């Protein structure tokens, strides 16, 4: 199944968090926070939000940081994804 987000929404897939700390301590699943870094899977067309035209600044494949409590979690083909507004993306990771 493929998801096509509407308006200024973006579909992202969380990137896995480190399982060990810098000092070598292995973290159990219950102690790990959900990562705030993700890969963009799909991007909406943009549009008008609150009377302003929104240009999409991210594209599929970008790695991004996003706000901790933003978006809606969904499950598609046994894959956990998140749909959020472009405003909830804090920055694009450039390598």
UniProtKB/Swiss-Prot annotation:
GO terms for biological process: chaperone cofactor-dependent protein refolding. Its main location: cytoplasm. It holds the Pfam family Cpn10. GO terms for cellular component: cytoplasm. PROSITE patterns: CHAPERONINS_CPN10. Coiled coil: none annotated. SUPFAM superfamilies: GroES-like. Disulfide bonds: none annotated. It is found in: Cytoplasm. Heptamer of 7 subunits arranged in a ring. Interacts with the chaperonin GroEL. Belongs to the GroES chaperonin family. HAMAP family: CH10. PANTHER family: 10 KDA HEAT SHOCK PROTEIN, CO-CHAPERONIN GROES. This is Co-chaperonin GroES. It comes from Clostridium acetobutylicum (strain ATCC 824 / DSM 792 / JCM 1419 / IAM 19013 / LMG 5710 / NBRC 13948 / NRRL B-527 / VKM B-1787 / 2291 / W).
């Amino acid at each position: 199944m493929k998801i096509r987000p509407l308006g200024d929404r973006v579909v992202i897939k969380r990137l896995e968090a480190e399982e060990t700390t810098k000092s070598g301590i292995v973290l159990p699943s219950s102690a790990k926070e959900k990562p705030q870094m993700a890969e963009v899977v799909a991007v909406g067309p943009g549009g008008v939000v609150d009377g302003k035209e929104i240009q999409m600044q991210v594209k599929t494949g970008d790695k991004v940081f996003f706000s901790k409590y933003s978006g809606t979690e969904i499950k598609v083909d046994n894959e956990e994804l998140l749909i959020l507004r472009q405003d909830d993306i804090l920055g694009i990771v450039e390598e």
